[in-house]
Amino acid sequence: MNTMTTYSGRKFDPMQMTPGDVYIEDIAHALSLLCRGGGQLTYFYSVGQHSLNCATEAKARGWSERQQLACLLHDASEGYISDIIRPVKIYLSNYLEIESKIMGTILTHFGLDDLTEEESCRWKQIDDEILEPVSYTHLRAHETSLHL
């Protein structure tokens, strides 16, 4: 058995994760330290902050608390297995399977394992909409007069 130790001190095998292994403190801590976009931003922007922004946007749109929670948790698996940028992730089918399995366990823990296809598409919509401005604004936000 290959175990990981979480921020809270719990030990478990992420390949055999159960809903009882899920602790929001572990997810929140890890996501707060994980930079979006592989760190290729003008300033540090955590996956945790992005998740909060997605949930806040869902609330602003008048979506249900269930949908807000789904938005908050949409990257929660990355709290256990980190993040890989989208252009690379699509080529890693084994990683995608592991990520999906862990995400399913997390959703079960929070009572969201029965999300409809429409509900899943809604959080993906916000994720994409919030991702785009970060990609374009933060990646290109600085101009430098330094020429080497």
What are the functions of these language-model segments?
Residues 8-22:
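N- or domain-start disorder-to-order transition segments that initiate the globular core
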Residues 25-46:
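Active-site flanking loop/helix segments enriched in acidic
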Residues 26, 30, 53-60, 105-109:
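Residue-level signal for well-ordered alpha-helical scaffold segments within enzymatic catalytic domains
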Residues 39-66:
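Alpha-helical phosphate/pyrophosphate-handling elements in metalloenzyme active cores
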Residues 63-136:
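Divalent metal-dependent catalytic cores for phosphoryl transfer on phosphate-bearing substrates
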Residues 137-144:
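Conserved small/polar residues in nucleotide/adenosyl-binding loops
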